[in-house]
Every structure is written in C-alpha cells, then in structure tokens.
Curated annotation (Swiss-Prot):
Coiled coil: none annotated. It comes from Acinetobacter baylyi (strain ATCC 33305 / BD413 / ADP1). The gene is hflD. It is found in: Cytoplasm; Cell inner membrane. Its main location: cytoplasm. One of its GO terms (cellular component) is cytoplasm. It comes from the Bacteria. This is High frequency lysogenization protein HflD homolog. Belongs to the HflD family. NCBIfam families: PRK00218.1-6 (NF001250). It is a peripheral membrane protein.
Length: 243
C-alpha cells in the first residue's frame, strides 16, 4: 500500500465529499462515452488529463483501508474533477428514464454517461461483496504501482491502461448484466481503444466504491437531487476560488 499522493489544506463537509466522489464516477463514464463515440485520440490533451487523474485516484482507493473521508486526498485539486462535476450537473437537470421499453434502450447520446454511471453504482456493490473480485483488484493495484517505476510514472502508458482494463474484465466484466457501451463499431476492433474504455470504467468502479464508503446510496441520490445539485454548485464555486 502507498500513501495517498496529495493532501488538500481545506476540508469539505460529508455531503460535498460524497458529491465529489460521485462526480468522479460521472467523469469516468463521460470519458468512456467520448472515447467510444469519437475515438481515444479525439478527446485531446484535456480528456487525457482528466483520465490520468482518475487513474491515479483509482490506484489509491482501497477496498477497506481508506481512512480518509476527504475525496480530495485522492486528487490534486477540484479542477481535476471539473468534467465530472459538469457531467453530473447536466445529468441531474436532465434525468435519465429508468424504465426503458427494451433491454437495450435507445438513449440520446447525452444521456449515455448517466446510464453507465448508474450501472457502475450497481456493479460496485456486487464486485465488492465478492472476496475473489476484491482480491483481484488489490493484486492489480499492487502490480500496476510496481510497473509505474519502469514507465517513469507514466500513468497513460499502454501497459498500465491494459492492466486497468484487465482488472475491469476480471471483476465487473464477469457480472451480468454487463455494461453495453455504444460507439463506433469500427473503433472497437482496436484493442487499444477497448482497453481505454474498460480502463475508464474501472476508474469509475473505484470512485463508486469511494462514494459508497462515504455513505452514498442510490436511494439517497434519487430523493436528494436538490441537495446534490446545491453541493455540485458549491464545489464549482470553490474550484474557481482556489485557482
């Protein structure tokens, strides 16, 4: 185990920390969506930046050893999750219908990150209630953290992303119903492309676990949307005050 890489001087309250962890989930699913629809190259340096911050956090979120109650202990600054905050806010303002007419709902592309996020929140409970899957995640984290020294701490190295993707396949990828990611069919033939998508989903799974550790629940999220939106807006203001 390694210490969490960053420390922040200010403290957020319980609700704000929970909202920030949830925003991390939505950042992961937004990146999943962007990569699937337009390809890993088109998300640009900004998308890569947000992805790298999620990777760093996901490698330090432990199944049962997270003593910190501050989500920012796993990030450098609020700006690292700006994409997630924006995606989460949009999702709350445009709620996703939970009663699709078919098993594979034809959702507007803007709502796909929301559907992926809700699926990850459900998968997280199943993954972390299975000791075998928990062991896979811990082993994968240890392996990747050791590998980083060989790749000059390049979190975006193809081998690092491939191992994150494999961790997802070996855990959440074994549970039905699986997340069906919609995108460019031709791009899915490229293993680097699919690795990127699965690695993004793995980081979302980890942030979902942190959210759960901080007291997050699906019911609370559904019935406290107004409070959640207030917390997101407060975090957005704090982000600009801290720059």
């Amino acid at each position: 185990m390694v210490d969490t890489p960053f420390q922040q001087p200010q403290s957020l309250n319980v609700r704000q920390n929970r909202a920030l962890a949830l925003a991390g989930v939505f950042q992961a699913t937004q990146l999943t969506h962007m990569t699937a629809m337009t390809g890993q190259q088109s998300i640009g340096e900004t998308g890569n930046f947000y992805f790298e911050q999620l990777i760093k956090a996901s490698l330090n979120i432990r199944p049962a050893l997270n003593t910190s109650t501050q989500t920012l202990d796993f990030f450098n600054q609020l700006g690292d999750i700006a994409l997630g905050l924006k995606t989460l806010e949009s999702s709350i303002n445009q709620p996703f219908s939970t009663t699709p007419k078919s098993k594979i709902p034809k959702l507007p592309s803007a709502k796909l990150p929301m559907s992926y996020a809700m699926a990850l929140l459900q998968l997280e409970k199943k993954v972390y209630s299975n000791p075998e899957y928990v062991a896979v995640i811990e082993k994968s984290q240890q392996k990747i953290l050791k590998q980083l020294s060989f790749f000059d701490n390049n979190y975006m190295h193809p081998s690092i992303i491939a191992n994150l993707a494999q961790a997802y396949v070996d855990t959440a990828g074994q549970i039905n119903p699986r997340i069906l990611v919609r995108g460019n069919a031709e791009s899915f033939k490229d293993p680097n492309h699919t690795n990127r998508i699965r690695a993004s989903l793995f980081t979302g799974l980890q942030l979902a676990h942190l959210w759960r550790q901080l007291g997050g629940s699906s019911w609370n999220m559904i019935f406290s949307k107004r409070k959640l939106l207030q917390d997101i807006q407060t975090l957005a203001r704090l982000q600009y005050q801290m720059v």
